[in-house]
């Protein structure tokens, strides 16, 4: 231990406890914390609350804050599972999930489920906010982003749950903020596949409006 002052420097040595054991890093056994299992193509979705930090900062009761996130995340997870999605994780107020059946890009039914799931989530906002009001909590809005591409599937040594890595995850996260409030942003990979499906064309012909969003590189 070294004690320094403006006027002088003094070095003092503390006694070492007799039970203390020095650890030689060379003797440590190296184990992989993250193991990459496989790579596959699939559709990935992010659903994220808009301005949740500002909203929850005005809620003084911690139990109310927990209920706020609980209602949103559990409702979104239930809808996602109903359409065949697998929940990957939540990061704060953002729920991340994927659709394993979309690994086959010709499976129109699987991609139709992706569309129906996202639309159902948007339509569920009134129901979610009704639950919020019953708990005397403020209303919320959210954004959904979805994209399709190659992901690396990994598993932690301390967890049995899969995690996903890769550029498509980064892109899906990036375009989420570009989605309109209570709307959906679709990445280029997913858009190209959906364009060939009649179900997507019928959406464009009806009440849903699609427009290109330019995202900066980097």
What are the residue ranges of the model-derived segments?
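Intrinsically disordered, glycine/charged-rich C-terminal tails and inter-domain linkers
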Residues: 1-30, 160, 181-218
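Catalytic NTP-binding/metal-coordinating core of nucleotidyl cyclase/transferase enzymes
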Residues: 30-113
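Conserved protein kinase catalytic core
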Residues: 54, 153, 193
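Hydrophobic alpha-helical membrane-association signature
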Residues: 68-72, 117, 121, 171
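Structural signal for well-ordered, non-membrane alpha-helices
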Residues: 73, 77, 119-122, 126-129, ...
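Catalytic core of nucleotidyl cyclases, primarily class III adenylyl/guanylyl cyclases
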Residues: 83-110, 128-167
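Catalytic/regulatory signature loops of cyclic-dinucleotide turnover enzymes
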Residues: 147, 167-192
